[in-house]
Structures are given as structure tokens and as C-alpha cells.
Regions:
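Long, low-hydrophobicity, acidic/polar, solvent-exposed interaction domains
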Residues: 28-222
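Bacterial Sec-dependent N-terminal signal peptides
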Residues: 1-36
Length: 222
């Protein structure tokens, strides 16, 4: 397996094209973050960044999401490097805590700073980045009255109501319905899907759906 290395200068850090797993060394201990893969590039490069890591850990029979944000600076772009093996139900609560911390720190806030998920670009053989700054998460069921797009675990199956559809057809289907009152469009992800599967869904959504929206749907994890 090849590795993605990190290179830092005075004002910016750039990811170099070398790996699919991050190797971190601290106190003689090696820690890996196995990244999701995709053959679609969303954002190729991010500068002025802070890396944050969420590791896959096992303690007894329990899986743990362990966060390392020692290098994070509020005013920079945050890159979340998250292990693809973690279930979404463990990842998103940690992501929400990080979002809340950054949004609440008005003293050091930079309106231009973004948050990104990193993933391995299998075409460019380097890291690519997926923005999620404006995404709001909820660890619950959507409220009644919302129009739910459901993303199932394991088979890349997407449903609107009882109808299975392609991700590229979500907006076409939504706008074709003659609502008396247009409901909020929301996304619901199976909490037991892997983070890798979630990112693969999100990359397709960014490509075909959300880049065409002014306001992003709230994402429910349940």
C-alpha cells in the first residue's frame, strides 16, 4: 500500500501525492487512517489548512472513534481525515462536536475558512477533498412534513418515498411533484453504514445534486 505524505511550509500545508493511508508517528507509535476511495475528483487542493484525524480503534468488543485535533486552528480550513471502517453512528457525533466548536468561536472566526472530508482519488492518485462546511447534522429521525431521501446501507440504494431512484434524478423527481406546499428536502442516512459508503454517496450528491442548491438539505443519521 502506498502512502499520502504531508508537507508543511510557513503559511500553508499541501498534501503530496504518495498514499492511501496516513501514517502518524508519535512517541514511537504508528497510527493509520485508512481513507475512502473514489474515482471522482471534487476539490483537488486546499491551502492554509489544519489536519484533524479520526482513528478506528477497538477496545475489547467495542469500536471506538478516536479524535486527534491537536493541530487544528480555528481560522484555517479544516481537513477531516477519517477512517473508512468506522460506522457513521460513531463518526457524525464527533464531526458535530468539531463543527460546533468552530462555529462558536467568533473571536478567531474566518468566514472564508471551510471544512472538508479527505478521500483517496483513485484516478489522480492523490488526495481529493469534499466540502461540508454548510452541512447541518441531526442524530434522529426527520420530522413529519419533510420530504425524505433515504440512503440505505450496503447496496447503494436510494429511495424517495417508496420509489427507488438514481442519485442523479433526485432533484428532477422532487421538482416534478406538484406540492400544495413545498416541503423541506432532507437526507436520511442509515446510521450503520460505513463512513466509506457515506462518503461515496456524498461525492455523487455533490456532483449531481447539492452543487445546484443554495441551501443544503439537513442530514439525518438514524
Amino acid at each position: 500500500m502506498t502512502n499520502f505524505a504531508l508537507k508543511k511550509n510557513k503559511k500553508s500545508m499541501k498534501y503530496c501525492t504518495l498514499i492511501i493511508a496516513f501514517l502518524l508517528f508519535s512517541c514511537g507509535k504508528k497510527e493509520d487512517v485508512l481513507l475512502p476511495k473514489s474515482n471522482i475528483t471534487i476539490v483537488k487542493e486546499v491551502q492554509d489548512l489544519s489536519p484533524i484525524y479520526i482513528f478506528f480503534k477497538v477496545e475489547g468488543k467495542d469500536t471506538i472513534a478516536e479524535v486527534n485535533r491537536k493541530s487544528s486552528i480555528i481560522s484555517t480550513n479544516w481537513i477531516l481525515n477519517i477512517d473508512k471502517r468506522l460506522p457513521l453512528k460513531l463518526v457524525i457525533p464527533e464531526v458535530m462536536k468539531l463543527q460546533e466548536k468552530k462555529r462558536a468561536d467568533s473571536a478567531h472566526k474566518n468566514e472564508n475558512a471551510e471544512n472538508y472530508y479527505s478521500y483517496a482519488d483513485s484516478i489522480g492518485k492523490n488526495l481529493s477533498f469534499l466540502p461540508f462546511t454548510k452541512v447541518f447534522y441531526k442524530m434522529e429521525k426527520p420530522t413529519a412534513g419533510s420530504f425524505v431521501v433515504y440512503f440505505g446501507k450496503g447496496k447503494k440504494r436510494v429511495f424517495m418515498g417508496n420509489q427507488e431512484i438514481k442519485i442523479s434524478e433526485i432533484l428532477k423527481h422532487f421538482y416534478s411533484i406538484k406540492f400544495v406546499k413545498v416541503p423541506d428536502l432532507v437526507f436520511l442516512f442509515d446510521k450503520n453504514m460505513s463512513y466509506e459508503e457515506y462518503i461515496q454517496y456524498k461525492i455523487l450528491l455533490q456532483k449531481d445534486v447539492t452543487q445546484n442548491l443554495d441551501t443544503l438539505p439537513v442530514e439525518f443519521i438514524f
